[in-house]
């Protein structure tokens, strides 16, 4: 038996398979405002935060065990990630911001210095500008490609990607249709 083991061809070692969970942020004020006043709800207030209900959603959500959290640098996603994953390393990535960027002021992020003060455990090194340029046209294909490259080059195996409904739907379906929206705080398994 020992000689058979020695004679057996070596099994090629492939890189470990990555596991990703896409999570839409919890309910934000722009979601409530949209229900009350329509599209104006997206254009009145920049970088909206979570509602009390949103904080509750994040607190009771079932957060899959992960090694790292990649998070959009918008207030509502950072709050969601911090509530769902308080002890997991988090990296904010500009490429995870919501689409579209040109018309919805609710998708314009806060100043980097403010975000660093509010979320001291988050790595904001990807944010190169203090103030996000606006309007900021987005290439969704390039953004998804960048996240995939980051994940594939990382040593970690399990990731949460805390972002936005339209962004996640583009990854999952290749389309940017706003409706129907994904469920708040639900972990969608992403294929890479």
Give the role of each language-model region:
Residues 11-92, 116-118, 186:
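Active-site-proximal alpha-helix that buttresses catalytic centers in soluble enzyme cores
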Residues 18-23, 70, 154-167:
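Beta-strand elements within well-structured catalytic alpha/beta cores of enzymes
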Residues 28, 167-168:
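Short active-site segment of divalent metal-dependent hydrolases/proteases
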Residues 29-33, 37-49, 84-145:
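Phosphate-handling substructures
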Residues 63-65, 151-157:
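Glycine-rich phosphate-binding loop signature in dinucleotide/nucleotide-binding domains
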Residues 79-83, 103, 170-174:
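A short acidic (Asp/Glu
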Residues 175-192:
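Domain-level recognition of soluble alpha/beta enzyme cores
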């Amino acid at each position: 038996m020992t000689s058979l083991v020695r004679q057996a061809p070596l099994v090629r070692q492939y890189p470990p398979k990555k596991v990703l969970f896409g999570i839409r942020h919890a309910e934000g004020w722009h979601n409530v405002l949209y229900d009350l006043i329509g599209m104006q709800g997206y254009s009145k207030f920049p970088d909206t935060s979570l509602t009390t209900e949103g904080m509750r959603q994040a607190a009771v959500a079932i957060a899959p065990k992960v090694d790292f959290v990649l998070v959009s640098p918008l207030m509502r996603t950072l709050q969601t990630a911090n509530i769902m994953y308080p002890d997991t390393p988090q990296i904010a990535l500009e490429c995870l911001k919501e689409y579209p960027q040109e018309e919805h002021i609710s998708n314009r992020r806060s100043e980097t210095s403010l975000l660093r003060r509010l979320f001291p455990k988050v790595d904001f090194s990807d944010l190169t500008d203090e103030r996000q340029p606006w309007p900021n046209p987005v290439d969704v294909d390039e953004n998804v490609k960048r996240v995939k490259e980051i994940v594939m080059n990382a040593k970690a195996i399990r990731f949460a990607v805390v972002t936005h409904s339209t962004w996640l739907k583009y990854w999952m379906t290749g389309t940017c249709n706003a409706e129907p929206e994904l469920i708040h705080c639900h972990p969608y398994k992403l294929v890479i």
